[in-house]
Regions:
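A short local loop/turn or secondary-structure capping micro-motif enriched for an aromatic residue
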Residues: 58, 67-70, 135-139
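Core segments of cupin and vicinal oxygen chelate
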Residues: 20-64
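Short beta-strand/turn micro-motifs at beta-sheet edges
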Residues: 3-6, 66-72
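A generic structural micro-feature
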Residues: 9, 42, 73-75
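Histidine-centered active-site/metal-ligand motif
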Residues: 16, 56-59, 80, 112
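Vicinal oxygen chelate
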Residues: 1-8, 13-22, 70-154
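Short loop/turn motifs at secondary-structure junctions
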Residues: 10-13, 36, 77, 105
Length: 154
């Protein structure tokens, strides 16, 4: 379907993200037990599907070769996947404590004004972000704020 005004597609939402991993047996417990995603299906021994909310799946992990090289940091491609965990700074503090207690190396903690975030790699180096939204819709008044990023002390 297209949007009748411009001929462009009428995108109605983001369906899912598929991440390549070297070892499903290592990655599945991370996404299920550390991140708390609901494991909802498998495609043989090559893919595992997870749901964040009530969708059939939001994230899938695709097994690649165990010796596959990671993409260079400056290569085109997906930079990170962001998962909303709440709306309060206290929820973000609790998330940081949980991640650290589970051996996750935090790479950075940022205040984006519109949201506050913790970034960290999954077992294969895919960068993930957990975030809480700012209660105020400040970006409606100043769209430049969407691109703001400064260090956040938690």
């Amino acid at each position: 379907m297209t949007d009748n005004r411009s001929g462009a597609l009428n995108v109605q939402g983001l369906g899912h993200v598929v991440l390549k991993v070297r070892d499903l047996k290592r990655s599945v417990p991370f996404y299920r037990d550390v991140l708390g995603l609901k494991e909802v299906g498998h495609f043989g021994d090559r893919m595992v599907f997870f749901s964040v909310v009530d969708n059939h799946h939001d994230i899938a992990l695709l097994q690649t070769r165990e010796d596959a090289a990671a993409a260079p940091v400056d290569a085109p491609g997906l930079a990170h996947v962001a998962l909303k965990i709440g709306d309060s700074l206290e929820e973000l503090r609790q998330a940081r404590a949980w991640l650290e207690a589970n051996g996750v190396a935090i790479s950075r903690v940022r205040d984006h004004i519109v949201s506050r975030s913790i970034y960290f790699p999954d077992p294969d180096g895919n960068e993930l972000e957990v975030f809480v939204d700012n209660e105020e819709k400040v970006w409606l008044e100043d769209p430049e704020l969407v691109a703001t990023s400064k260090e956040l002390a938690l």
